[in-house]
Amino acid sequence: MGKQQETILIIGAGIAGLTTSRLLTNNGIPNVVFEASTPDRSQGFAISLQEFGYSALLAALGDLPFSSLIRGVAPDRQIGGSGWIDQALRDNRTGEVLVAPDLTTAKQTIVRANRNALRHWIADCGEDELDVRYGHKLQRIEGRLGDVTAVFENNARYKGSLIIAADGVNSTVRSQILPNVVPETIPLIHYHGEFQLPHSAFDELIRPHSRQSNILVGVGDRFNTPLSICNITKSQVHLDWSYSRTVKGENDILYRPNVPSEEAKQIPPALLEELDTLCLAEPWKSFLNSESVKTHRVFHWTTRCVYITQDDARHAGEQGVVFVGDSWHAMPIFGGEGGNHALLDGVELADAIITSTSNSGKGSWDNVVKNYYGGAWKRSQDAVRRSTQRFFLLHRPATEWKEISEKKKQIA
């Protein structure tokens, strides 16, 4: 029973949960990951990893080389690519480059990563297999720090010394422990589509515009249309697109923040009509139109942010819960830093646990919570505010984009 009590229970097998589990496992600290979904769940879209996030992970995994990450997660890894992006913002009605950094001499610092591949790569970065138990949907938490119990809907009960909430923006753990913390809905419309092309069609329709970049970002008059490579092989290319814009008044029929999950997979006729009025340039024009979109898998995404105060974090810690990832710092996907801070959360929390365990032989859980939040709280909450502000700036009027572009040209 004593050994079981020292086990750390991780709720959620996303990036943050798996990072924490992998680092704990590599250091011989017992832990179990519980995931509500089945092993075949898919989150195959791509995210941007920045140096501050992946460098900390590589170091914590034993100073793995940058090339190991690229070979494991880059969307174009199967054709020898490196997940490179040009970081350019283009006028999606003309194709003109509005803003672009000078990348001629700089080293690659941003890596585009397939989310599924990243999860698998993290899970595989060690000799011992992670203990991930799927089909475990959390029902409630009992106990306090040092002696907690997780109760699941399948009637399973597990005891441990600490619960790590890695269960996302709609965290079940957070809703029980901190019911006052409710995700803030951002008043923006966001639709996401997925489709595939033969490699030959990709080379003809998209490659002339994107060249070697794994994402082609188009910005318009208060709306965005990024095209992104999710996975690419010698014969097939899996891509996705996003269409996001600011809300137009109180009766905007496309603004549906509380749409049921099944309805969120249906394509509203109003979206098809709106896409056909955008007057897009190629390559966006070929894919973001009513006829093409009908053949894609389309999802309505509600953009939400989560803020947690230091007092809330301390209160949760007293009840045996520590937060990582979107459960406590959800931020916008486009222009956000969420995946990077999820990695940092896992690295920093694991380090706090490992340090405490090595110093005392068993975890001093009060110190673990204190030391983790001592740095992670400000870092992550600042990132939520910064990412939200950036998200709105990326939906600015076309006139402002033109002004920015002209100023860049004058400086150059």
From Swiss-Prot:
Q: Which InterPro entries match?
A: FAD/NAD-bd_sf (IPR036188)
In alphabetical order, the GO MF annotations are: monooxygenase activity
This chain belongs to which protein, by name? FAD-dependent monooxygenase nscC
| Assigned keywords, A-Z | FAD, Flavoprotein, Glycoprotein, Monooxygenase, Oxidoreductase, Signal
Q: Does the keyword Flavoprotein feature in the UniProt annotation?
A: yes
Cofactor(s) recorded in Swiss-Prot or TrEMBL: FAD
Q: Enumerate the SUPFAM superfamilies for this protein.
A: FAD/NAD(P)-binding domain (SSF51905)
The domain of life is Eukaryota
Gene name, Swiss-Prot/TrEMBL:
nscC
